[in-house]
Amino acid sequence: MEEDEGADDGEQEEEEVLLVNVGSTYPCKRSDGSQHDADIVKTRYNKQAGREEYYVHYVGLNRRQNEWVDKSRLVLTKPPKEVETNGTDQEEMTEPTEQPDSKTPQKRKLEEPEPEPKKAKVEDKDASKTAASLGAAGDFAEELTCPLCVELFKDPVMVACGHNFCRSCIDKVWEGQSSFACPECKESITDRKYTINRVLANLAKKAACTPVTPVEKKTRPLEKCSEHDERLKLYCKDDGTLGCVICRDSLKHASHNFLPILDAIGVYREELSAIVAPLEASLKVTEQLSGEQSDKIEQHNKNVSQYKEHVTSEFEKLHKFLKEREEKLLEQLKEQGDNLLTEMENNLVKMQENQDAIKKTISLAKERMEETDSISFLTDIKTFIDKCQEQQRAVISTGNTLLSKELCQGTFKGPIQYIMWKELKSVITPSLTPMLLDPNSAHPNLHLSDGLTSVRYGENKLSLPDNPKRFSQCILVLGSQGFDSGRHYWEVEVGDKTAWDVGMASESSNRKGKIKLNPKNGYWAIWLRNGNRYKALESPSKALSLTSHPRKIGVYVDYEGGQISFYNADNMTIIYTFSATFTEKLYPYLSPFLHDSGKNVDALRFVHNQ
């Protein structure tokens, strides 16, 4: 039983050796494979991994390299066992190696001073306790030091992750930020909130009242100047480096500008804030534009699908019409061909019947002619000859006429495409609308033809009654027919004119005084000036680049679709398209413009189907 108990005590002792103590320092394996001394700052239990983890600070390294590690990365060693020394052992260590002989009396040994092993052991333990207390005091002092200002805590507060800072220090760090994080562990913090740590405040006050000791003056290697071994308190604005007071006064930093670390943090945080603010505004604009661009892309894809469906539908109508006409024409060809073939085949049958009858008569006549018996030859010879003559007359009366029937070339071998095009024009939607001009809207300098199909500019004003529809200053005239639904297409002949306007106007658009022609004012139009300068009258106007000079302009209106398109009607190439939502009736409008020193005297003329 005693041996078992001894084994249990040994196991317990081994477990105690392998325990990890907060505030102690152990060698720790870093993620890069190197090994470095690390202070154990705090512990936590990872429920997901099912293990204890330790938050370590690598001695002499930047606090940003602090991390959570598990026990396997700590190098834990079992301390050597203390061996108690008795008086005999002490004697062996202090006495000369000379062995007493057997004759040496026991009295001499007793007269020698007794060693004091227990006292020495107590002194060793006191020294150990002193060192331990110094280490603990150093760790305690470090725990009472703000990691930002590296001074004892003043009005300490604890943030959500559990780290503590001076209230003024954390306020300076978080000032002007839109998102927050712990300066120690970089953990994100949702709200700018912290809790007053009264316990830590009391401890810091007590530490401040304690006489200064070497432990209290201890600074971590990270916060010391590598050159002068002094605390880093200043920031050099010229070199962008941290320094101590000696650095500031050295020749290396002569005439350099220094700031206290916290002031430098505030200055550069303000600079970053000045950079971040416009960037955040730009980000907001970019995000908005990105969303709008996504909407545009989505709408574009919808338009592609809709346009594809429209094109397919329009061509299906054409295909259907042409297919029906093709089938009808082929049916006519078959019917006419079959009828002619039947006539010729019937004629051939008659010819073959006559041929057989003639062959039979010839055969009988030759057979009678070869008869050698005179009596047999002459018997009923007249009757036989009459039958032969009757057969001859029958053949002659029937007649062997060769029939040569021809298909109608004009129908089946004529200009089929042109014929189909002429028929197609009657079913095309929209077809060419025959437009007329409204004389009640014409400017007094415009002269309309008797048929109201053309207009030209006249130097002399006509005496016309004024009315709300008439243009008083702009040289324009409306069409007499307006559109408030459906799809429509019309054309105007512009010929070799050097200036003109062609477009659409809303019913309520202004007709009096000087008018700005654009969609906002109810006008959708294109114009030509100086013989080669084309524009779409948008707001602002847009210059148009045409590859050829159109002699006819086509205008297409899809009222429900909100579309007004202009074409070069000579080859149906698109010139420009307006998109809008129409709420009232639209009327065509024309302007032949001024004479331009005799270069622009021709009239504008609506095109009608011939």
Swiss-Prot record:
Tudor-knot domain location: 21-75
Pfam families: PRY (PF13765), SPRY (PF00622), Tudor-knot (PF11717), zf-B_box (PF00643), zf-C3HC4_4 (PF15227)
Domain of life: Eukaryota
Positions with biased composition (Basic and acidic residues): 108-127
Location(s), subcellular: Nucleus
Gene Ontology molecular function, alphabetical: DNA binding; ubiquitin protein ligase activity; zinc ion binding
Main subcellular localisation: nucleus
UniProt-recorded name of the protein: Nuclear factor 7, ovary
UniProt organism field: Xenopus laevis (African clawed frog)
